[in-house]
Amino acid sequence: MQLNIAKIYISRLLLFLIIINLSACESVIRGKEYILPGERENILIGSANIKLAKSFDTIQLSEPLVTNRWISSDRETTNNKNNIAFSEEFIKKWSVNIGQGSSKLNLSSVSPIYIGDALFVVDTENTISSVNPDNGAINWSKSLFPEGEDPKIGFGGGLFANSGIIFFTNGFGELYALDPYNGDILWRDMVSSPVRAAPIADNSMVFVLSVDNKINAFDIQSGSKKWEYSWFSDTAGLVQTSNMALFEDKIIVPYKSGEIFVFKKNNGNRLWADSVNRKNIKNSLSQIKDITASPVIHGNLLLTVGFQGRLIANNVNNGFRVWELPISSSITPVASNNYLFIVSNDNILFAIDAESGDVLWTHDINSNYEFKNDNKIISMQILQNKLYLFLSSGDLIVHDPKTGKLTDILKNKIEGSTIPPIIVNKNLYVISNDGELISYR
């Protein structure tokens, strides 16, 4: 009898040790986990459980900004679009075909950029064009993909402009540095895997994040590699991906694993890390951990949201977790003055105090608008003190950012698109699904 009891105790002890080892497995694979300071509360899953602030001062936005450039898909290296000046007339000025449009298997994904006196756009077959923003005339076009490859296969990537150079990445893992005036290739390099996100650059280096969670840093003039950093690669993810950000001497990198890393941009030393993944999901294996909305820098705050994770705010300098909310989103949020606006994956619109994380108001978009077929929100912008939601159908939903009240629904106001529009010099530019670049004022 005593022998049987001893066997039972030994079996239970072995089971306990196995569980402990399994729980530590992720730390073994990924390396040491850095637990950042800051409050962490157990929260329920779903934005419906969020409580509103009891009272708040009237929301005041910053003055509308007249933009004269748009160097990345999210305007600047901070990924914050702010409150942008626009005529709000949405009158079509011109339209020009830029190449192959979207198909069911190959959606347009590269956002246009605007620098100097030209727009730069890419079609679904990796043809980049320079376009005159006044009349839509094509200045030059160039196909950029490896010889012998099908250009439709290398989807994704993006554009970025800095230091008089246009940088372009594609799904073949190529990085090009181009002369903006004639499209001449200044230099070209390759990374180890396909690239779905746009590159980002300062005055000395350009950075590329590939789908295998590896970041590469290249000299902006010569193309020589300066450093690289590899991280755990999560195979479960989405085609859509977010952009990196730059802040002072730091580069902010969102990974497909749901983690956000901050590096010293000159040498790749990791400064701190955090995660948007929720710890209380019953089956974490079913969670898509991607960060598809770009991280936004607003003041000293880094604001990051996961596709099925949460919205977190960190001090960008030291990683201190300031606050978090159970909000998931694939749309890059917008900050203006001291306020953050975000739309969740279940189409709930939020206004948040950026410093405290207090939710000031919410609005359920589904209560006023029926999403049919594949129609979805592709972008959120604050234009001329109004909160615009751009839909893939070309519809626009307009809210008052001070109260969240719906003010207008504009049906088929612009051409349907899968790419967020850009706004420069009070003109709005859209790449339509059929490969047309259209200018609205």
Model feature map: region roles:
Residues 26-29:
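Bacterial signal peptide processing site
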Residues 116, 123-124, 163, 170-171, ...:
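Structural signature of WD-repeat beta-propellers
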Residues 21-24:
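C-terminal motif of bacterial Sec signal peptides marking the signal peptidase cleavage site
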Residues 35-51, 57-93:
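Blade/loop signatures of beta-propeller domains
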Residues 64, 93-113, 141-160, 186-203, ...:
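Extracytoplasmic beta-rich repeat domains
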Residues 132-135, 179-182, 219-223, 265-267, ...:
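Short loop/turn segments that connect beta-strands within beta-propeller blades
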